[in-house]
């Protein structure tokens, strides 16, 4: 059975880029009757917070992603410690004592000599006495994994290719001689992402690892750890990264692109899902009504090789398609949270929904209709015309036909037509050049408010 995982770090709220990875894994599992695991990468106990764990779960529920299993790496430290000890005993995990500053200086020297900035394994030359002396000075080791890029002498590094058939990008190759031995354990004893991830993927029988292409080099190193632990390799797939329009990478600092903020702004879940999945693929970005329809247009092989750019204007446009199809019953609860309620609420929604991009935008039109303010938005020359319009406003209760009757009478009386006739009335009554049909707005505004706004 196919088994995939989504492994966010609960050190912040997930953004649209994380969402794309989650959806690719979720849809791949759905397409293949597989299992989807949510695994919190919470080994950083200081920065990981329960509020972010709760937030990630809320976001996934909103995206209609339902994990089959949920795991926390913070509950598996004893397992990681056991594997780490085994690797240390085999000489595959070795202690290093350089400070960040020392490593930085060494890197600059290598670059100045036009050498690749790869760690030279000098720590392997330390004797027991050297290590005792360094530790007596207060230094604590970080631990590196010894990459198998040599025959017998670890200081005689040779070209060593690690290749895999990437299920998204095709054959990928990494030369282990071009990368440093990865640090797996920090000076304080905490684990970096690499080792716990491999151990969990083995223990949880993950069959397919689908993640961003920024992990390609990391995959080459991780494959050697899988092999060192005599584990079966999963299939790897690396999808193009989602960036901003300017090409900047997304991060948890892009709070305006977090799923939490997009949800609170009133975007529809399916709009976010459609754009996340279809951006950067050969498929057209379209509004698919539900996840089943989206799944029919999902394929890892459709992913392009270039970066996918996320444009908020695309999301707004896509979102409007969903909003225009929403019935009053579907949005009633959300409208009530915006204080939009009462006997005219349904008529109001049906009137304005085709002219808004997000459900939250309804609050603006509710305010326009119910506010006591007047809109001083017409020219001085139009004020006489507005006074004439008051005199010709149809008697009795206003309905859908009142606008046509009113403007016909005004046209005959003033010889105005087209924009000169309609725009002055729209500006005076709504303060805006564009919006819902005026014939639908008149019954919502009511006679008294109309007269007040026309009498400047």
Curated annotation (Swiss-Prot):
NCBIfam families: gltX_bact. SUPFAM superfamilies: An anticodon-binding domain of class I aminoacyl-tRNA synthetases, Nucleotidylyl transferase. ATP binds at residue 252. InterPro entries: aa-tRNA-synth_I_cd-bd, aa-tRNA-synth_I_codon-bd_sub2, aa-tRNA-synth_I_CS, aa_tRNA-synth_I_cd-bd_sf, Glu-tRNA-ligase_bac/mito, Glu/Gln-tRNA-synth, Glu/Gln-tRNA-synth_Ib_cat-dom, GluQ/Sye. GO terms for biological process: glutamyl-tRNA aminoacylation. The keyword Protease does not apply. The lineage of its organism: Bacteria, Pseudomonadati, Pseudomonadota, Alphaproteobacteria, Hyphomicrobiales. It catalyses: tRNA(Glu) + L-glutamate + ATP = L-glutamyl-tRNA(Glu) + AMP + diphosphate. Pfam families: Anticodon_2, tRNA-synt_1c. Catalyzes the attachment of glutamate to tRNA(Glu) in a two-step reaction: glutamate is first activated by ATP to form Glu-AMP and then transferred to the acceptor end of tRNA(Glu). Keywords: Aminoacyl-tRNA synthetase, ATP-binding, Cytoplasm, Ligase, Nucleotide-binding, Protein biosynthesis. GO terms for cellular component: cytoplasm. The keyword Kinase does not apply. This is Glutamate--tRNA ligase 2. GO terms for molecular function: ATP binding; glutamate-tRNA ligase activity; tRNA binding. It is found in: Cytoplasm. Monomer. Its EC number is 6.1.1.17. It comes from the Bacteria. Its main location: cytoplasm. A motif ('HIGH' region) lies at residues 8-18. Belongs to the class-I aminoacyl-tRNA synthetase family. Glutamate--tRNA ligase type 1 subfamily. A motif ('KMSKS' region) lies at residues 249-253.
């Amino acid at each position: 059975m196919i088994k995939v995982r989504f492994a966010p770090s609960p050190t912040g709220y997930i953004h649209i880029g994380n969402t794309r990875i989650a959806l690719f894994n979720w849809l791949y599992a759905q397409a293949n009757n597989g299992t989807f695991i949510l695994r919190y990468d919470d080994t950083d106990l200081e920065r990981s917070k329960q509020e972010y764990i709760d937030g990630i779960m809320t976001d996934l529920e909103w995206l209609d992603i339902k994990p089959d299993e949920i795991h926390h790496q913070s509950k598996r430290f004893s397992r990681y410690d056991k594997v780490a000890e085994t690797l240390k005993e085999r000489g595959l995990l070795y202690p290093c004592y350089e400070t960040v500053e020392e490593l930085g200086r060494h890197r600059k020297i290598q670059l100045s000599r036009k050498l690749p900035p790869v760690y030279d394994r000098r720590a392997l030359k330390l004797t027991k006495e050297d290590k005792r002396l360094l530790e007596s000075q207060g230094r604590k080791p970080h631990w590196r994994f010894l990459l198998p890029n040599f025959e017998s002498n670890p200081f005689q590094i040779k070209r060593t290719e690690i290749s895999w058939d990437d299920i998204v990008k095709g054959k990928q190759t990494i030369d282990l001689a071009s990368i440093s031995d990865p640090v797996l354990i920090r000076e304080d004893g905490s684990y970096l992402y690499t080792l716990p991830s491999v151990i969990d993927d083995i223990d949880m029988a993950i069959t397919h690892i689908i993640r961003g292409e920024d992990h390609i080099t990391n995959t080459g190193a991780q494959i050697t750890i899988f092999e060192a632990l005599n584990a079966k390799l999963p299939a790897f797939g690396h999808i193009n990264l989602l960036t901003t329009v300017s090409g900047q990478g997304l991060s948890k600092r892009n709070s305006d692109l977090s799923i939490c903020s997009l949800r609170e702004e009133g975007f529809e879940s399916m709009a976010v899902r459609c754009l996340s999945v279809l951006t950067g693929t050969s498929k057209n970005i379209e509004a698919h009504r539900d996840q089943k329809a989206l799944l029919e247009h999902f394929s890892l092989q459709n992913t392009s090789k270039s970066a996918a750019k996320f444009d908020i204007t695309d999301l707004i446009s896509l979102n409007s398609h969903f909003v225009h199809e929403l019935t009053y019953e579907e949005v009633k609860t959300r409208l009530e949270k915006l204080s939009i309620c009462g006997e005219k609420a349904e008529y109001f929604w049906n009137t304005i929904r085709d002219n808004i991009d997000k459900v939250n935008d309804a609050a603006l039109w509710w305010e326009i209709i119910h506010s006591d303010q007047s809109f001083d938005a017409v020219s001085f020359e139009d004020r006489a015309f507005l006074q004439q319009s008051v005199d010709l406003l149809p008697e009795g209760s206003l309905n859908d036909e009142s606008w046509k009757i009113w403007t016909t009478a005004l046209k005959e009386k003033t010889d105005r037509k087209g924009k000169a006739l309609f725009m002055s009335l729209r500006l005076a009554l709504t303060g805006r050049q564009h919006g819902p049909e005026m014939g639908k707005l008149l019954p919502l505004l009511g006679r008294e408010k109309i007269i007040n706004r026309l009498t400047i």
